[in-house]
Amino acid sequence: MPSRNILVINCGSSSIKFALVNEAHSLFPLHGLAERLGSRDAVLRWKRGGDSDSLMIPNADHRAALAQLLPMVQNAAGGKLHGIGHRVVHGGELFTHATRIDDRVVEAIRATAPLAPLHNPANLQGIEAAMTLFPKLPHVAVFDTAFHQSLPEHAYRYALPEALYREHGVRRYGFHGTSHRYVSHRAAEMAGLAVGDSSWLSAHLGNGSSTCAIVNGQSLDTSMGLTPLEGLVMGTRSGDVDPNLHSHLARTLGWSLERIDSMLNNESGLLGLSDLSNDMRTLEQEREQGHPGAALAIEVFCYRLAKSLAAMSCALPQLDGVIFTGGIGENSPLVRAKTAAHLRLFDLRLDQEANARCVRGVAGPIQAAGHPRVLVIPTNEERQIALDTLALLD
């Protein structure tokens, strides 16, 4: 039986990230990004093999961009595409695993939009456009929140009036589930352990960041909550703050809820602390030049990350290893070293040479001999979405 091809789509409000995944090959035959959709500057960029190219598509919407992409995908797939996997940010409590998309699923995703107003409507745009263009192909939704539906109630409930949960779904959902699941499976494979008999602390660190406690292949706790704002310090997101900050700023500065929400999501985190940048690479460079804001931002980021990992350990029966993934987790030896140094009670120690070597896609163990396992594992959410899609086609 010839190997199968899955197109993976991740739609934002004005962008489409795409990858063609072949089940038999680790490299993507085709991948790219359509961005600034709906504007005169809309552009489609792609890589195929070692070649890169782009095409201006002025005023194109999601459907027009996908239509431009269609012949490219068919050509790269050798004329045979077997299905389309869609990343959907929020599945609420309705979806605990990947699901074939039909009218009922579309309406359920629409119903969860109030829980992810910036993401789910955009995800739906991509789904509806793709289903129009590829009506005969199976479409599968893979939810960021689904992996965390195994959280026990004591981990997902807030200490709020019960009616808010029962009537309005106010609870902790968690995100980055596809990434945490993928790297925990890879970690078990690398360590020679069974997924169903292993326990991991996972740190997905990028512009959005979260930690996760994974036991026997299930998420038992995670740092993000009702929204992706809860938890760690991130690129522009504050992470955890005093819940009374809203009323304090409204009372003392006269700020509206919208202004406070924008500040916490778009002006805080590494950017707010450093007053310089949300990019860890820039901050590390500026720290070397003596920039105090950059140094502080990195210190706060690593300390808060270590605190979160320590908190996640409450859900583990034993620790088989700590996993670093995501753009920062995969590429910042400094962040990994500083975080490990804060976790002295875990007896974590890193091998400096191994830590320095694991960047730009290099995976591997970075712990010093005789100390608990620490792994750097590049995430591959596109491949995981493709695998979930293929599983529903079998």
Curated annotation (Swiss-Prot):
Pathway: Metabolic intermediate biosynthesis; acetyl-CoA biosynthesis; acetyl-CoA from acetate: step 1/2. ATP binds at residues 17, 204-208, 279-281, 327-331. The active site is at 144 (proton donor/acceptor). Its EC number is 2.7.2.1. Mg(2+) binds at residues 10, 381. It catalyses: acetate + ATP = acetyl phosphate + ADP. Its cofactor is Mg(2+); Mn(2+). PANTHER family: ACETATE KINASE. HAMAP family: Acetate_kinase. This is Acetate kinase. It comes from Pseudomonas aeruginosa (strain ATCC 15692 / DSM 22644 / CIP 104116 / JCM 14847 / LMG 12228 / 1C / PRS 101 / PAO1).
